[in-house]
A protein has these predicted regions:
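N-terminal accessory regions of S-adenosyl-L-methionine
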Residues: 1-98
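A short, well-structured juxtamembrane/interface segment
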Residues: 91-111
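Flexible, charged surface loops at secondary-structure boundaries
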Residues: 107-113, 164-171, 194-196
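Conserved class I S-adenosyl-L-methionine
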Residues: 112-121
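Conserved SAM-binding loop of SAM-dependent methyltransferases across substrates and taxa
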Residues: 122-132
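S-adenosyl-L-methionine
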Residues: 135-169
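A short SAM/SAH-binding and catalytic strip from SAM-dependent methyltransferases
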Residues: 170-185
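C-terminal substrate-binding/active-site "lid" region of AdoMet-derived donor-dependent transferases
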Residues: 182-246
Length: 246
């Protein structure tokens, strides 16, 4: 059933803690456990983790070199990679960011910039980026998470309406993890082109993958932003990156 929690937070934390305890001699596994636990602890407090997640999948060499002593390693990567679903179901957060990345984003946008976040979800980015208007029509409610709980004040607007209202007043528009159904993202990009938007459209998503519409990726002029990808690295099977889009 949509919105039903299948990945209980407490159960997942216990699983990761058990993996850590059983693999104390495997430094790589312990480090990954610590990253996951620190991320969950921070988000429970409505704070951002201080450091980014690194790739959670265990290497084939590590698994097979230690398989006799640690047969459970065959299942550990899958358990680690459940993190995003845990975040979605328990926090309503699809895009997992960290404080280092937010600092990079703030530097890129500028200390005095005015910003708009569309399809903001629970507005984690807006809550941590200065002078940012958070907007979302909350039509994702019930899709793995029943209860929107924004981190900051949010104006209930769909993406196109929000862009029409604010594009001439902001320097940066941020769109993170837009859904791959519909073509609202493409409508937004068309509107900005037609109205000669002079600011930056910053998109966080997986090209031709889990986020955004096919039409958007087919028509977007994309530039990877090194500054915004140094502390934003794919950690699971979804290769999301930060793009400047024209």
């Amino acid at each position: 059933m949509a919105g039903e929690i299948t990945m209980e937070l407490d159960n997942y934390v216990e699983q990761v803690q058990a993996i850590r305890q059983n693999c104390l001699k495997l430094t790589t596994v312990v480090e990954k456990c610590d990253q996951i636990l620190a991320t969950l602890d921070a988000y429970q407090q409505r704070k951002l983790p201080k450091c980014e997640l690194t790739e959670l999948e265990l290497s084939t060499d590590l698994i097979f070199d230690n398989l006799i002593g640690y047969p459970q390693l065959m299942d550990v990567s899958a358990q680690f990679e459940n993190l995003r679903q845990v975040m979605i179901e328990n926090f309503g957060i699809w895009h997992i960011c960290n404080q280092l990345w937010i600092d990079d984003l703030q530097t890129f946008c500028g200390p005095n910039s005015c910003n708009l976040e569309i399809m903001a979800g629970n507005a984690v980015i807006s809550a941590n980026l200065k002078n940012t208007i958070a907007t979302d029509n909350l039509d994702w409610q019930g899709q793995d998470n029943e209860r929107p709980c924004p981190w900051t004040a949010m104006e209930k607007l769909d993406a196109v309406t929000a862009v029409r209202k604010y594009y001439s007043h902001v320097d940066n528009i941020i769109m993170a993890w837009a859904p791959d159904s519909g073509d609202v993202d493409w409508q937004v990009l068309q509107f900005l082109r037609q109205n000669h938007f002079q600011g930056n459209l910053i998109v966080i998503g997986e090209r031709n993958g889990a986020t955004n519409s096919a039409k958007f990726w087919q028509n977007a002029r994309l530039q990877l932003i090194d500054q915004l990808n140094q502390h934003h690295r794919p950690f699971d099977f979804i290769n999301d990156q930060v793009w400047l889009v024209k």
